[in-house]
Design a protein with these regions (language model features):
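Metallo-beta-lactamase
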Residues: 167-231, 235-236, 245, 276-285
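N-terminal pre-domain segments of enzymes
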Residues: 26-49, 104-105, 111-129, 381-385
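Active-site metal-binding motif and surrounding structural segment of the metallo-beta-lactamase
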Residues: 76, 87-170, 174-176
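Cap/insert and terminal regions of metallo-dependent hydrolase folds
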Residues: 87-90, 100-129, 144, 251, ...
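Divalent metal-coordination and catalytic microenvironments
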Residues: 58, 72, 82, 96, ...
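Accessory terminal helices/loops
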Residues: 18-42, 287-293, 303-388
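Bacterial N-terminal signal peptides that target proteins for export
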Residues: 1-13
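Conserved beta-strand hairpin/beta-sheet module of binuclear metal-dependent hydrolase folds
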Residues: 51-111, 239-243, 247-253
Length: 388
């Protein structure tokens, strides 16, 4: 066999080996066709159940109480933003007491390395301290699912006003303070006259503000707390609550993640007020990296969000508002606007055809607050031409 023939034979043998290896590898890698399945949706909480989630620092969120509730727990006591609906009062109070007990246990003083006399007179005196009381309840709006638990939470809390005390100092305590915008108290008081739905006095706000903002006069649980009025948004008495140290904002009903916002036209709400409120929240917030993270926000309903979520929500509402506004300027009727489907791009994420707040109700509220349905203003009469 010549040298050329040997080389050709070797190359042929190598090619045959490679082809066989490729065929065997392909047989080994043969798998069933790939199939894709949709991940199951997050299960909703069973009715009447409350879920506690940590937000940041000493702040927690309660879900399932009718409205989302933000709870601050610390050395100064307990503060709640909103009180849920009336039927959930006992479970809300149980969740708050659980958080307070856990905080007290985590912050028990460590054993002191001093003499026995000091340990018995100092440490033991604090280890048995009871859980901290509820000091404040903030109402972000007038709705029943936000103020329903006011009475029970107020009566379970304590406010020490100082002054002369005869006897036990605990006897001088009042219930927890309830803070809200003045319009909330005005509307609740107006609906609390003689009648079946009258609210007891303990369910009404004890302190109100009527300016642009209100801040506590002192730190509470290590941070400043401010209430800021959002005029004519969901209603005319909406507030957001800004926890400055932990950088968390309780939004109330100016946003509902996963749903269009409820605009209560009868109580002064408007689409422009909602958009303005969201713009103000975005100005207050700070992102951590590339529009993500940073300031955390708890809306009145739905999951927690950050400033990127709020900006997307604001943009969505602005687009819908501008579409409806253009139709109003063309003197289109409400039925024509609904038929034009101005929310169509977003209905899969935010829309609803049933329940307490539907897509049609949202479109109608936007339409009305933009002046839709009002008779067009009469054109000014022309002056008669002067005779020459």
């Amino acid at each position: 066999m010549t040298r050329r023939a040997r080389i050709a034979s070797t190359i042929g043998a190598l090619a045959a080996c490679i082809a066989g290896a490729i065929s065997l590898h392909a047989q080994q890698r043969t798998v069933a066709p790939t199939t894709f399945t949709r991940a199951p949706m997050i299960q909703a909480l069973p009715p009447g159940e409350i879920e506690i989630l940590p937000v940041r620092g000493n702040l927690y969120a309660l879900f399932g109480a009718g409205s989302n509730i933000v709870v601050s727990v610390g050395a100064d006591g307990v503060m709640l933003v909103d009180a849920g609906k009336a039927g959930m009062g006992d479970k809300i109070l149980a969740a708050v007491q659980q958080l307070s007990r856990e905080w007290t246990k985590r912050n028990e003083p460590k054993p002191l390395g001093w003499g026995a006399e000091t340990r018995s007179s100092v440490a033991d005196r604090h280890i048995t301290a009871p859980p901290k009381p509820i000091r404040y309840v903030m109402n972000t709006t007038v709705d029943a699912d936000h103020i329903g638990g006011n009475e029970k939470l107020r009566n379970a809390g304590r406010t020490f006003t100082g002054g002369n005390v005869a006897g036990d100092i605990r006897d001088s305590a009042e219930g927890a303070a309830i803070l809200a915008h003045e319009n909330v108290l005005t509307r609740l008081a107006a609906s609390s006259g003689e009648g079946q739905n009258a609210l007891p006095s303990d369910a009404l706000p004890t302190d109100t503000y009527f300016e642009e903002a209100y801040k506590l006069s002192h730190y509470f649980n290590g941070e400043g707390v401010r209430l800021l009025h959002m005029p004519n948004a969901h209603t005319d008495g909406d507030s957001i609550v800004y926890f400055r140290g932990t950088d968390v904002i309780a939004l109330g009903d100016i946003m509902s993640s996963g749903a269009y916002p409820v605009i209560d036209v009868a109580k002064g709400g408007s689409i422009n007020g909602i958009v303005d409120a969201l713009n103000r929240v975005i100005d207050l917030s700070q992102t951590e990296f590339r529009l993500e993270g940073g300031t955390l926000m708890v809306p009145g309903h739905g999951r927690m969000v950050d400033s990127a979520d709020v900006a997307y929500y604001r943009d969505m509402l602005t687009i819908i508002r501008d579409r409806v506004d253009a139709m109003v300027k063309k003197n289109m009727t409400l039925e024509q606007v609904v038929a034009a489907n101005p929310t169509g791009d977003y209905d899969t994420e935010y829309g609803s055809t049933s329940g307490p707040w539907t897509t049609r109700q949202f479109i109608e509220a936007v339409y009305k607050t933009l002046g839709g349905g009002k008779p067009a203003a009469a054109a000014p009469a022309k002056r008669p031409a002067r005779k020459p």
